[in-house]
Each structure stands twice: as structure tokens, then as C-alpha cells.
């Protein structure tokens, strides 16, 4: 059970990191 929770947190962290990086690059291109 804890392994599934850790996996879910890892996927959520990766998704947040990639989305933040994408938005950051997008904002840099807009400037």
C-alpha cells in the first residue's frame, strides 16, 4: 500500500516539475 502511495507521489512530482519547466520555457519565449 505504501509503495503505491510513494509511486503516486513520485508521478505527481514529476508531472508538476515537467509542467513547471514547460511553463517557464513558454514564459521565457514570450518575453
Swiss-Prot record:
Signal peptide: none
Topology relative to the membrane: Single-pass membrane protein
Transmembrane segments annotated in the record for this chain: 3-23
Keywords tagged on the record: Chloroplast, Electron transport, Membrane, Photosynthesis, Plastid, Thylakoid, Transmembrane, Transmembrane helix, Transport
Family annotation (InterPro entries): Cyt_b6/f_cplx_su6 (IPR007802)
Quaternary structure (record): The 4 large subunits of the cytochrome b6-f complex are cytochrome b6, subunit IV (17 kDa polypeptide, PetD), cytochrome f and the Rieske protein, while the 4 small subunits are PetG, PetL, PetM and PetN. The complex functions as a dimer.
Protein family membership: Belongs to the PetL family.
Protein name per Swiss-Prot or TrEMBL: Cytochrome b6-f complex subunit 6
The organism of origin for this protein: Trieres chinensis
Phylogenetic lineage: Eukaryota, Sar, Stramenopiles, Ochrophyta, Bacillariophyta
Gene: petL
